[in-house]
Design a protein with these regions (language model features):
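Short beta-strand-to-loop acidic/aromatic patch adjacent to the donor-nucleotide binding site
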Residues: 83-94
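Cell-envelope/extracellular polymer assembly enzymes that use nucleotide-activated donors
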Residues: 9-14, 183
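Catalytic donor/gating beta->alpha subdomain of glycosyltransferases that bind UDP-sugars
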Residues: 107, 114-140, 175-177, 182-242
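Glycine-rich, basic loop-to-helix element that forms the pyrophosphate-binding segment
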Residues: 65-81
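Membrane-embedded multi-pass helical conduit in multi-pass membrane proteins
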Residues: 249-320
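Short beta-strand/loop segment that forms part of the nucleotide-sugar
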Residues: 40-51
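Short, well-formed alpha-helical segments that are part of the catalytic scaffolds
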Residues: 19-35
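Long helical/loop segments within the catalytic core of UDP-sugar-dependent glycosyltransferases
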Residues: 71-73, 97, 103-170, 175, ...
Length: 324
């Protein structure tokens, strides 16, 4: 296998394009800023499904045609590139360049093994986009940091993270999954103490804006979760962390609804106060309290879809194994 460069670069930005996608101006602007800081120690690698024309850039940039999940592409990157740090960023992300530069400065100066921040929703003009915004606030501001503080977190934002190559080289799960964030997070949770979790919003993305789009997304996440769960089942520590993650992200609403039922049984006013408090906690900005209330009622539909997908995939996986 040919290594891209024998000399060690400081920083490699890796992104991923699907068919009919091209390298975005947003990422190019970020890359130019990083090139001005790191010079020839900076490079960009684009994993693409189809080659496309790239205008000449002052920084080194390379297209690699490679099919498969983002996780498989990351594993492939470890085998061909020797940069000291990898920044993985989705092609559709609008990066917050100023905060990313500050984030990387701290990451490298303090010799962190891995780091990430928050990803925001770039627009919310209809009710589904508002639901996703509230769900992201709940995930990034409450569930994820709480689980990491309890030493049971495994979720990192797959849209953007930075890791030190030498710490993870040949250490990550040798599997295939849609959920690269959880596959990497499992290893981080168990073995990596030196992690930089920034409270800054490092980028934004356009949310799914239709009901069916969210259904299909959650179905795909369910497939990714269950295949990952089956692949690590014999690892007790990984299994425990993954099950806790699944409960916290996809079944917390059951507890919320159960408590809501209890409070309404006691007193209608008490029940309404409870719903109002929960809506206020998960809404940001605070003028979205009404939509947070709607979120509590509607969004469990997508968690149920996720659960059905998980059960369906596990049953099919076990039947497949029995036939082998």
């Amino acid at each position: 296998m040919v290594v891209l460069e024998e000399c060690m670069n400081k920083l490699c930005l890796v992104t991923y394009t699907r068919k009919n996608e091209v390298y975005t101006t947003h990422l190019d602007e970020l890359a130019l800023e990083l090139y001005h800081i790191y010079g020839n120690g900076f490079k960009v690698i684009i994993y693409c499904e189809e080659f496309f024309d790239l205008p000449k850039k002052p920084y080194h940039i390379q297209l690699i045609k490679y099919h498969g999940t983002k996780y498989k592409k990351l594993l492939h990157l470890f085998s061909i590139d020797k940069s000291e740090y990898f920044i993985s960023i989705d092609n559709d992300i609008t990066p917050n360049t100023y905060d990313i530069k500050s984030f990387l400065e701290i990451m490298i100066k303090e010799n962190y093994s891995i780091g990430w921040g928050k990803i925001n929703v770039s627009k919310y003009s209809n009710v589904w986009e508002l639901m996703v915004l509230i769900d992201k606030v709940l995930s990034h501001n409450i569930i994820r940091p709480t689980l990491w503080k309890l030493n049971t977190g495994i979720s990192i934002p797959g849209q953007f993270f930075c890791l030190k190559r030498s710490i993870f080289d040949s250490k990550l799960l040798n599997t295939d999954t849609y959920l690269d964030d959880l596959a990497i997070g499992l290893y981080v949770s168990k073995y990596i103490d030196k992690r930089y979790i920034s409270d800054k919003i490092l980028g934004s993305e356009a949310p799914n804006n239709t009901f069916m789009g969210l259904v299909l997304q959650r179905w795909r996440w369910g497939i990714g979760y269950s295949t990952l769960l089956l692949s690590i089942w014999d690892n007790c520590s990984y299994r425990r962390r993954l099950l806790i993650h699944g409960f916290a992200y996809h079944f917390l609403w059951i507890i919320i609804w159960f408590l809501c039922y209890i409070f309404f049984e006691i007193n209608i006013i008490l029940g309404l106060i409870y719903l109002g408090v929960i809506s206020f906690i998960i809404s940001k900005p605070k003028n979205l309290v009404f939509y947070s209330f709607i979120y509590e009622i509607v969004f469990p539909i997508f968690h149920i879809v996720w659960g059905i997908s998980v059960i369906n995939t596990i049953i099919r996986g076990r039947k497949h194994n029995e036939c082998l």
